[in-house]
């Protein structure tokens, strides 16, 4: 994979993860934090965008989902810190590094 393709793939995975997290976080706010049921409308839209974004990758869907998982984990941890204000631990960092390593191994194999 070229450096440009890797950057595009990681960027698309990151945007995809944000769409998925928003699509799941809004119902969480409704169910657990007394948010408005109206939050379900943007949540549904966000999840539809998430599904569409996953179709934009040039590999079989199973490989895309597996590789995407690594970026999702890192994005979810960043969300945890930025949006929910939680502190990240060394375990979070080590786990994120392992998942990104797995993602990289899978993504490199797309062309083989």
Swiss-Prot record:
It is a multi-pass membrane protein. GO terms for cellular component: plasma membrane. The chain crosses the membrane at residues 10-30, 36-56, 64-84, 90-110. It holds the Pfam family UPF0060. It comes from the Bacteria. Keywords: Cell inner membrane, Cell membrane, Membrane, Transmembrane, Transmembrane helix. It is found in: Cell inner membrane. InterPro entries: UPF0060. Its main location: membrane. HAMAP family: UPF0060. Belongs to the UPF0060 family. This is UPF0060 membrane protein IL2332. The lineage of its organism: Bacteria, Pseudomonadati, Pseudomonadota, Gammaproteobacteria, Alteromonadales.
């Amino acid at each position: 994979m070229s450096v440009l393709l890797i950057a595009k793939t990681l960027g698309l995975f990151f945007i995809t993860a944000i769409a998925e997290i928003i699509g799941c976080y809004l119902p969480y706010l409704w169910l657990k934090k007394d948010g408005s049921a109206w939050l379900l409308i943007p949540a549904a839209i966000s999840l539809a965008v998430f599904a569409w974004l996953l179709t934009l990758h040039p590999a079989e869907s199973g490989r895309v989902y597996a590789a995407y998982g690594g970026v999702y984990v890192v994005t979810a941890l960043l969300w945890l810190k930025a949006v929910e204000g939680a502190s990240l631990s060394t375990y979070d960092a080590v786990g994120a590094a392992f998942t990104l390593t797995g993602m990289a191994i899978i993504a490199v194999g797309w062309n083989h």
